[in-house]
Amino acid sequence: MDPLSISMESKVVLLGSSDVGKTALSLRYVDGIFPKRLTSTIGASFLTRTINIEGNKIKYLIWDSAGQDRFRSLATLYYRGACVAILVFDITQQKTFDIVKGWVEELKANIQEEIIMVLCGNKIDLEQNRQVKSETAKLYADEINAMYVETSAKENEGVEGMFLEIGKKLILNKHNEYFKQFQQQQKLHKQFQQQNQSLYQYHIQQQKHQQQQQQQQQQIFKNQQFYNNGHLQGSINGHNNQNSTNYSDNSDQCCG
């Protein structure tokens, strides 16, 4: 196994109006089916799928949230902690595209951590009824720093590719995170080395200072010894000279 390979779980939440095809996209991707009849999701549904991308393992935890307004207040429970938000609109209904913009503002207001946003124009099998131009959607995706994809859950177009691109982005982000952690560790290691070097230099300076103090003390001691010995010798010499003088004086007196 490649030591640089990644194994991760990623929470993915699908947001958007009711009947834009969120549940159909989830079922197409996870189970490979397109149900002929679907009822509106109540609250949220939960599906999982694990994929491998170039030796990296990703387990998608897919939350399909309800699009009805009466469940809007519960949405924060579903997108909290999500790594990816897929904002789905129906290309044949301009209103669903406008509603997506409200979801974007809500995400920005309630999510502090970085999240991958994907703007998904679904139902391209109904191209003849398109109301939202691809160019318009792409410009908005660039504005919010999101990926833009177009899909058809019915015809199984773009669905696999969307989750593949999401996976590649997740892997890239994880590698970047590891690289930042490595850089931080290197920075801390460098600071630690610098601190150790400073402590070592301080220790050397202290040793030199102690040696200088010892040398000074030794020199002072030598000077004191020299002074004491010189003073003692001078006293002895002075005493001898005095005795000699007295003796000479006495000799002169005796001879006289």
Curated annotation (Swiss-Prot):
Record: residues binding GTP: 16-23, 64-68, 122-125
InterPro entries named among the record's database cross-references: P-loop_NTPase, Small_GTP-bd, Small_GTPase
Compositionally biased region (Polar residues): 230-256
Location of this chain's protein in the cell: Cell membrane
Membrane topology qualifier: Lipid-anchor
Chain residues carrying a lipid of type S-geranylgeranyl cysteine: C254, C255
Entry keyword annotation includes GTP-binding: yes
Pfam families noted in UniProt: Ras
Record key words, sorted: Cell membrane, GTP-binding, Lipoprotein, Membrane, Nucleotide-binding, Prenylation
Motif (Effector region): 38-46
Cellular component aspect of the GO annotation: endomembrane system; plasma membrane
GO molecular function: GTP binding; GTPase activity
SMART domains to which the protein is assigned, alphabetical: RAB (SM00175), RAN (SM00176), RAS (SM00173), RHO (SM00174)
GO biological process: endocytosis; intracellular protein transport
Stretches the record annotates as Disordered: 229-256
UniProt entry tagged with the keyword Membrane: yes
UniProt xrefs under NCBIfam families: small_GTP (TIGR00231)
Entry similarity comment: Belongs to the small GTPase superfamily. Rab family.
Protein known as: Ras-related protein RabJ
Organism of provenance: Dictyostelium discoideum
Gene: rabJ
